[in-house]
Design a protein with these regions (language model features):
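Positively charged, low-complexity/disordered segments
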Residues: 165-167, 171-182
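Nucleotide-activated sugar donor-binding and catalytic core shared by glycosyltransferases
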Residues: 1-164, 169
Length: 182
């Protein structure tokens, strides 16, 4: 099974899904394809689509995949690399209004240069043949980088949660002090 994930950005990722359709036509792919399409307005009869998945279901799709075609979100990429999968990553591009900036290109380049993934940012059709013989570098990655990033993201989320809690508390105090009804 080939698992495709485009993430959950509000603007969808049509370019990636259209390229998957082109892959099927050009390379005669008959393997089952399941695509998590998020908010993308897209219909096809060439493969199975699902809008969203929970975390456990998402990881199960990755585990069962022979290949993962992914947007360049760090969570999707790191989960796929950690699972030892062959990954083709397509960064969302600012020039196509897929993202506010081009930060995903940097992540794809770093991971591709390191031998963890294949860069398919500009063309999945051109990236597909690179899968043959590709052995993803992953042992050192899953042992060192992922736990560090997990800790960093968890700490940031905890700090952000405390900040927002404090903003709500202060906002309530200000509203109650300055209310004309008190």
């Amino acid at each position: 099974m080939i698992f495709v994930t485009v993430g959950t950005q509000p603007n969808g990722f049509l370019r990636c899904l259209q390229e998957v359709e082109m892959l099927i036509g050009k390379y005669g792919i008959t393997e089952e394809i399941v695509a998590q399409i998020g908010n993308t307005d897209f219909e096809t009869n060439k493969f199975t689509t699902i809008r969203f998945t929970g975390e456990n279901e998402f990881k199960k799709y990755i585990k069962n995949a022979s290949v993962v075609i992914s947007h360049a979100g760090s969570g999707a990429l790191f989960n796929s690399i950690k699972a030892g999968k062959k990954v083709i990553a397509m960064a969302r591009l600012h020039e196509f209004n897929e993202m506010a900036d081009n930060h995903q290109i940097e992540l794809v380049k770093k991971l591709s240069d390191g031998g963890y993934i294949i860069d398919g940012t500009y063309s999945l059709v051109e990236a597909w043949p690179k899968l043959e013989g590709f052995v993803p570098r992953n042992n050192d990655f899953k042992c060192e980088i992922v736990p560090v990033l997990d800790r960093w993201i968890s700490a940031w989320m905890e700090q952000e949660g405390r900040r927002r809690s404090e903003e709500r508390r202060v906002g309530k105090e200000c509203r109650s002090r300055w209310s004309p009804y008190h």
